[in-house]
């Protein structure tokens, strides 16, 4: 991945390393109404940004001088319980309306503090998106807008700006008891949206990784608050530029997918209580990737689908011929457009670890990737590429001592690779699960789920003794 260049959209920004505050917290996803449960096989890894969302008043106040431009008259009492007057709603523009945006739109539409007023996507009305379960997206839309026959006869995966506009307006019409609702603008180019939609309070960016920074910076320049899906950017310098812009303008932002819950705190509490002695290693492994990792660049040149703007999709990236292997979930596997498995899932599992242990940049990083072989002119040889992520890899990050914390190593594994099963687990005739996290100290080990949830000392006898010593209740059985 290249870290040495700044695309034209960022040339006037001075990158700097600076902290930022997470103003939005999320715990809910999918196309669900507030009281619905997740459908079977639904991907619940990505939290919605709407379980706790700032009011318009809070957003304006965090914007500093911008708050003085508005006179807000509270009318909650006049409107009754749950009523939020239009003057206090967050007016939201959704940039990017593919499968992940569709999964999250239910929680946004259900929030009384938010009014979706515009959608934007380079795809008009696509049917070639990818999903994690057959008809999951289509059936989720049907459930959300309460139309069981929506797009009857189509097994394609829908997405795009027209789909987004239809979802938003149908949902609002039914919530108001109306036959129709017309209040959601529709754009192909985010720049046009930002120029024309003067009343937008916040922008939610849910596009391929390589366009996150360009869209976020453009919105921040307009004084708009930004929610951007992980990762913040696809280049270190781009991420620093976004952070610096948000800090300089004192604008409320959300640059991470979620904060950890109490269940994820247990491992860190045990570490702080000395349950495993001095922490030396952290191991985190993921079943990702769930998309193809192509070892070769495509050579054929299929036509660009009708209604899909390839130039806008490329954004700040260099021009190249269109190919479906670059787009619609596939983008995660390419250096130019995505960040691989660790950028897809590492934010969820590692952010709390970095935050609570005070980890900064590692002093060194080494990666051991898998490779692909081919036969060329009767010769077996490895395929060399510098454009796509491997099917599997191990990454080792070494962190220098900081304060009272000694040096430690953090290991990331993906593509089916796991660390060796610890002796404590093998003695109980158990194996490591498909995903998980393990903390290794001088005097013991803690094993948990992918985000360190349901953390337990191993072996079980050690956990029982710890639970007794700290008056902790017996845990509920884990769902598998």
What are these regions (language model features)?
Residues 18, 23-25, 29, 33-224, ...:
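N-terminal glycine-/serine-/threonine-rich beta1-alpha1-beta2 phosphate-ribose binding loop
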Residues 91-95, 116-121, 186, 204-205, ...:
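Structural recognition of the beta-strand scaffold that forms the well-ordered cores
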Residues 97, 306-480:
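Glycine-rich, aromatic-lined ligand/substrate-binding cores of catalytic
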Residues 101-104, 126-129, 196, 291-293, ...:
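Short, solvent-exposed loop/turn elements at domain surfaces
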Residues 102, 213, 217, 240, ...:
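A structural signal for well-ordered alpha-helical segments within the folded catalytic domains
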Residues 225, 233-312:
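A contiguous active-site-proximal alpha/beta segment in oxidoreductase catalytic domains
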């Amino acid at each position: 991945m290249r870290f040495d260049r700044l695309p034209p959209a960022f040339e006037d920004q001075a990158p700097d390393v600076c902290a930022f505050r997470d103003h939005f917290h999320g715990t809910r996803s999918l196309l669900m109404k507030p009281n619905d449960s997740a459908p079977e096989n639904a991907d619940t890894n990505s939290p919605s940004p709407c379980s706790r969302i700032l009011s318009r008043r809070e957003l304006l106040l965090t914007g500093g001088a911008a708050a003085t431009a508005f006179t807000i008259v509270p009318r909650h009492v006049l409107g009754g319980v749950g009523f939020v007057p239009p003057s206090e709603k967050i007016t939201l523009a959704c940039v990017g309306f593919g499968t992940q945006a569709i999964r999250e739109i239910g929680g946004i539409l259900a929030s009384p503090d938010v009014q979706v007023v515009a959608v934007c996507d380079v795809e008009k009305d696509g049917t070639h998106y990818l999903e994690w379960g057959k008809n999951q997206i289509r059936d989720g839309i049907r459930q959300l807008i309460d139309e069981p026959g929506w797009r009857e006869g189509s097994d394609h995966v829908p997405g795009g700006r027209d789909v987004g506009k239809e979802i938003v307006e149908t949902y609002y019409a039914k919530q108001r008891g109306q036959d129709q609702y017309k209040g959601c603008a529709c754009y192909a180019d985010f720049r046009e949206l930002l120029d024309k939609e003067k009343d937008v309070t916040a922008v939610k960016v849910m596009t391929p990784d390589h366009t996150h920074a360009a869209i976020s910076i453009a919105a921040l320049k307009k004084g708009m608050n930004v929610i951007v899906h992980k990762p913040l950017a696809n280049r270190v310098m781009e991420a620093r530029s976004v952070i610096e812009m948000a800090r300089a303008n004192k604008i409320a932002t959300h640059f991470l997918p979620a904060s950890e819950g109490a269940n994820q705190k247990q491992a860190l509490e045990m570490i702080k209580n000395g349950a495993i002695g001095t922490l030396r290693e952290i191991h985190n492994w993921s079943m990702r990737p769930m998309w193809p990792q192509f070892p070769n660049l495509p050579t054929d040149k299929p036509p660009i689908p009708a209604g899909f703007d390839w130039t806008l999709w490329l954004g700040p990236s260099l021009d190249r011929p269109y190919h479906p292997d670059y787009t619609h979930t596939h983008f995660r596997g390419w250096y130019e457009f995505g960040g691989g498995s660790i950028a897809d899932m590492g934010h969820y599992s590692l952010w709390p670890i970095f935050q609570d242990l005070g980890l900064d940049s590692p002093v060194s990083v080494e990666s051991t990737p898998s490779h692909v072989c081919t036969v060329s002119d009767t010769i077996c040889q490895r395929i060399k590429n510098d454009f796509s992520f491997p099917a599997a890899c191990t990454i080792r990050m070494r962190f220098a001592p900081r304060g009272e914390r000694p040096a430690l190593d953090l290991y990331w594994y993906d593509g089916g690779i796991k660390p060796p099963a610890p002796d404590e687990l093998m003695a109980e005739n158990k194996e490591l699960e498909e995903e998980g996290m393990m903390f290794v100290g001088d005097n013991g080990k803690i094993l948990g789920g992918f985000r360190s949830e349901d953390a337990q000392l191993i072996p079980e006898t050690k956990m029982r003794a710890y639970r007794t010593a700290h008056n902790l209740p017996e845990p509920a059985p884990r769902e598998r």
